[in-house]
Regions:
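Secretory-pathway/luminal and periplasmic proteins that interact with or process carbohydrate-rich
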Residues: 293-302, 318, 377-389
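Substrate-binding/active-site groove segments that recognize
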Residues: 302-329, 341-354, 401-402, 427
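Short, functionally critical alpha-helical segments immediately adjacent to catalytic or ligand/cofactor-binding
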Residues: 272, 279-300, 311-312, 346-347, ...
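Active-site metal-coordination segments of metallo-dependent hydrolases
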Residues: 259-262, 333-343, 418-419
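Catalytic and binding regions of secreted/periplasmic enzymes and modules that target cell-wall glycans
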Residues: 342-392
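Cell-wall glycan-active module
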Residues: 2-15, 19-22, 26-27, 37-38, ...
Length: 440
């Protein structure tokens, strides 16, 4: 069963004068073109009438002659030429659309990566260890770039660093440290009121990349959810660990153990809803979210990939939008930062891996291992690890001669990237955890 298809607001690149999806192009194909050029009105109806008359007169030869005359008449020849030209134009338009789409996708990646590189270079004027947000960390700098706040969703730690090159020793140093701790605690408390939508719209890299968030239509979940739940940001000085360095004061605050489970619990309704629509285990969806982002809704990577389930707009995003809308579209970052929309998109991609790419693998557990690995590295790499071939049919044939355990072991032995091996191990382990701890 296909998941519901809610309204989405991605960045879409397509010519306004032509249909762009395969179904739409088919609908604009032979039958429509024939009608447009009069085949049904003149050629087909006329030939039907003549043939019927000929048959009635038992003149089979005559009917063949009539049909031949119809096919070679000036009108029919002109119509056939027009139709051939129409098909050629249609194919040229579709080819041009695909080229425009590929160009737009490539420009999106280049624009994002350049904006990120420029921002890091700017930060290095103040920070020797300049860094930006990633899959498990959300990083924010003050306007003057002399303060840095890092929320680490994997370790449940908030770190505030304040540059203080003039810090000395003795009483002045103590006073500076006291001031830095107070400022750090204030920054931590602010996280409880900083909405996800605000964090996204004010991100310097998004702004530099030319992403306009003035008309972002986010779900109520994104509008209402903050970077950290307010109950976990009310910290005291006693909870802060302070470290003085040559160029800065570092204040670390460890969040309560319940913080991680709280984030998981917030995503559980989404995982259940979309997993049910896709015919998947909600524990699997939760394990993927945990492994991809540690439930960081603002997760991103340099590829770039965005959000809880780390959707890459230019690869997985194409499959997802074609499934949802019948055409490939470029999902924007703000769309994928929305938890609701991201979990739906990620679950659809899991569904496609499990039920399309590896649908002919008979054993359910075997198919699951292949889909998990493919979510990280792509179906082609998984196929090569199983069958030493990029063809999915070859991988399917080999997989159907193996047990699930043998497939798991072969993936762990043959997958080229250590990251993917660790990914498969973590997801399968965490799936069991969510099955047991959350009764999924």
């Amino acid at each position: 069963m296909k998941p519901n298809k809610p309204k989405i607001y991605p960045v879409i690149f397509k010519p306004a004068s032509m249909p762009t999806s395969k179904p739409a192009l088919k609908r604009a194909g032979v039958a429509t073109a024939m009608a447009a050029y009069g085949f049904f009105a003149s050629g087909v109806l006329a030939s039907s009438a003549v043939v019927a008359s000929a048959v009635a007169a038992n003149a089979v030869v005559a009917s063949a002659v009539v049909l031949s005359q119809l096919a070679t008449s000036p009108v029919a020849v002109a119509q056939a030429q027009d139709f051939a030209e129409f098909k050629k134009r249609n194919q040229q338009q579709f080819s041009q659309f695909k080229q425009d789409q590929e160009k737009a996708f490539a420009e999106f990646v280049a624009r994002w990566q350049q904006a990120e590189a420029d921002y890091i270079q700017q930060l290095r004027e103040h920070w020797s260890d300049a860094k930006v947000s990633n899959k498990t960390q959300w990083v924010k700098y003050s306007d003057d770039q002399r303060q840095r706040t890092t929320v680490d969703y994997e370790t449940d730690t908030v770190t505030v660093e304040i540059l203080d090159a003039g810090a000395g020793s003795g009483a002045k140093g103590t006073a500076d440290t006291e001031s830095a701790v107070n400022e750090a605690l204030r920054q931590v408390r602010e996280l409880g009121s900083t909405k996800l939508s605000t964090a996204v719209s004010q991100d310097p890299i998004h702004i530099s990349a030319g992403m306009n968030f003035s008309n972002v239509r986010s779900s109520a979940r994104m509008q209402g959810q903050s970077v950290l739940p307010a109950q976990f940001t009310q910290v005291s000085k006693q909870q802060a660990q302070v470290e003085r360095r040559a160029d800065r004061t570092v204040v670390k605050v460890k969040l309560p153990p319940a913080a991680g489970n709280d984030r998981a619990s917030r995503m559980l309704p989404l995982a259940k809803a979309y997993a049910a629509q896709a015919g998947l285990s909600p524990a699997l969806v939760m394990a993927i979210i945990h492994t991809e982002s540690s439930f960081n809704p603002l997760a991103r990577s340099p590829i770039p990939a965005f959000g809880l389930m780390q959707i890459v707009p230019t690869s997985a995003g194409r499959d997802i939008t074609e499934y949802m809308h019948g055409e490939q579209q470029l999902l924007s970052a703000d769309y994928l930062y929305d938890p609701d929309q991201n979990v739906q998109a990620g679950t659809i991609y899991l569904h496609l891996l499990n039920n399309r790419y590896f649908k002919d693998v008979r054993d359910t557990e075997s198919r699951l291992y292949l889909a998990i690995a493919a979510y990280n590295t792509g179906p082609g790499n998984v196929s090569k690890a199983i069958a030493n071939s990029n063809k999915l049919a070859d991988a399917t044939r080999v997989a159907n001669r193996m047990t699930a355990r043998q497939i798991y072991d072969r993936l762990m032995a043959n997958l080229p990237a250590t990251e993917t091996k660790n990914y498969l191990r973590k997801v399968t382990s965490r799936q069991k955890y969510y099955q047991e701890e959350f009764n999924l």
